[in-house]
Amino acid sequence: SHIGIWFFLVPIVLTVSHRMIPFFSSRVLDNYVMVRPFWLLWFMLGLIVVHGCLQLMEMLAYLWILDLPLALCAFYLSYRWGWTRSFRAKLLAVLHISFTWFAISMVLYGLQSLIYMQSGKIVFGLAPLRALAIGFFTSMILAMTSRVTLGHAGRPLELDRLTWILFLGFQAAAILRIIADVSSAAAAIMPQLYIIAGLIWLFAFALWAI
């Protein structure tokens, strides 16, 4: 699974995001300047590949060296791409929110690595992976597919209410899964949170796919 995630999924979704989010933003926001620094993209892709190698070698204590810079790069791109301005249009906002999950996941991976280096304990469980898989991958699939479909169909570039609600469902599922792994206060109801998050994700994805 590490090979598929770090050598395939993350590089592809990151590259598509780097190319398309500024482009789509330029079609909606006035006086928008596209920022797509390719040197930064290649730098991030390099860090991602090394992260994957360290994961395969189970060298978790050193992941923070890669993941925290990745988080900073992602937050920087979100800022330069106009994160706050994107909320003027929901169809654009979902793209920016989805990309933010990549930065959040890298923060969680980095912090977990630092704590593991000091204590030898995995304190966040699978929370970083949930932020990456549910928050980033799933949300970006919905956001990008919705934008591309509307554009190619010649329909108004507006996100309908149902798709917006389903997108919020993905956000809720990601947050619940992260809380279940991170919060000690939620330990007693962890199985219930897993079930609720899973059902929300399945329901939202099924409705969107239909």
Task: Tell where the protein language model's regions lie, with residue ranges.
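Juxtamembrane membrane-water interface segments of multi-pass membrane proteins
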Residues: 1, 15-37, 53-65, 77-96, ...
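Alpha-helical transmembrane segments
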Residues: 1-13, 125-136, 199
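Hydrophobic core segments of alpha-helical transmembrane domains in multi-pass membrane proteins
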Residues: 3-5, 64-73, 197-200
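Small-residue-rich segments of transmembrane alpha-helices in multi-pass membrane proteins
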Residues: 9, 36-47, 94-107, 164-174
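Alpha-helical transmembrane segments and their membrane-interface exit regions
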Residues: 9-14, 69-79, 139, 202-207
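Core segments of alpha-helical transmembrane spans in multipass integral membrane proteins
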Residues: 10, 19, 100-103, 130-148, ...
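Hydrophobic, membrane-inserted alpha-helices
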Residues: 46-52, 73-76, 173-177
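Specific transmembrane alpha-helix
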Residues: 70-79, 96-106, 136
